[in-house]
Each structure stands twice: as structure tokens, then as C-alpha cells.
């Protein structure tokens, strides 16, 4: 089990308090990334490629950054498809497949993944953040728009414990 969180906005001081609530999900490593008003963090429980899978995973050759929680069961198949398109995969870490797969196939890549997952991919060049989870929601991904900024996390506590988050019932949705 790993944890991911992040948000958009100028003030990156929220990241440490968000990470506090996902830390229990990933005891092996912790990292963060901030650029162009995008702030990402991950805590990792190492399952695949114990040495090379620390996150956020920076794909320097295509200028993407990824945080990932999950497991890709058809890893070998997807790795081969991505390599056939000319991309180099340097590790055996699931996380490394996400950005080049997304770059090649766009959001169609998400339906090609067999597994359980939640992730965020930041395209630095185009300043575009994409978040996704598996279709069954096995891996949690909570999100909220607060003051026109996106906040997301593997743990709802990362969001609702922010001092400006207002907890209220949406009666219309009942």
C-alpha cells in the first residue's frame, strides 16, 4: 500500500500536512515535487523494484512526473507495447510505465491497465495534471475543488483536515 497526494496552487505549505495523513500507507520512502503551481507527494511501500521505484517518479526524457499507488498486473505486456513505440524503460517499477503509456495512448492507456491503481501524472511541458484511478475504485483517490484549486489524496483525511476545508452535507446529492 502506498499513498499519494497533491494539489494545484501557489502556496505549497499544505503539502506536509497532507503527507502526514498518507505516511502510514508507505513506510519505505517518501518524496515530493513542486513546480509551476503543481505539488505532488508520495509515500511508498516497496513491492516491485525495491531500489529504483522511489516517487515522485521523474521521467526526464519526456518531462513528466508521476505519483502512483497500486499494482499493474499486465506490466510485462504494457512494457513491451511501450518499448515497441521507441520508449526506454529503465526500471522494473510499475510507476515508470504510466507516463510514456499516457504520452503514447492518451487516456485510452488507463483502460489498457489491468490492475488496481490511483495516480497523478504531471506533464511539465504542457503544465497539465491528470489524475485517475482503477474503474472499481480498489485504490482510493479522493479529490476536491477548493477555491478553484484541485486537492487529491489516497486518504480523505489529507483533504478534510486542511484548515480551510469546510465539511458540509450536500443535501441535493442525497
Please report, for each region that a protein language model flagged, where it lies by residue.
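Cysteine-centered catalytic environments shared across enzyme families
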Residues: 1-174
Amino acid at each position: 500500500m502506498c499513498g499519494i497526494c497533491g494539489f494545484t496552487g501557489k502556496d505549497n505549505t499544505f503539502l506536509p500536512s497532507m503527507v502526514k495523513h498518507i505516511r502510514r500507507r508507505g513506510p519505505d520512502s517518501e518524496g515530493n515535487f513542486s513546480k509551476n503551481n503543481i505539488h505532488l507527494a508520495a509515500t511508498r511501500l516497496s513491492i516491485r523494484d525495491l531500489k529504483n521505484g522511489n516517487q515522485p517518479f521523474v521521467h526526464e526524457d519526456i518531462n513528466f512526473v508521476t505519483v502512483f499507488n497500486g499494482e499493474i498486473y499486465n506490466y510485462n505486456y504494457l512494457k513491451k507495447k511501450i518499448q515497441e513505440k521507441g520508449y526506454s524503460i529503465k526500471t522494473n517499477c510499475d510507476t515508470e510505465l504510466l507516463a510514456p503509456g499516457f504520452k503514447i495512448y492518451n487516456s485510452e492507456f488507463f483502460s489498457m491497465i489491468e490492475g488496481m491503481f490511483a495516480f497523478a501524472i504531471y506533464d511539465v511541458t504542457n503544465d497539465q495534471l491528470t489524475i485517475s484511478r482503477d474503474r472499481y475504485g480498489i485504490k482510493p483517490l479522493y479529490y476536491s475543488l477548493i477555491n478553484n484549486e484541485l486537492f487529491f489524496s489516497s486518504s480523505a483525511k489529507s483533504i478534510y483536515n486542511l484548515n480551510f476545508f469546510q465539511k458540509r452535507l450536500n443535501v441535493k446529492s442525497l
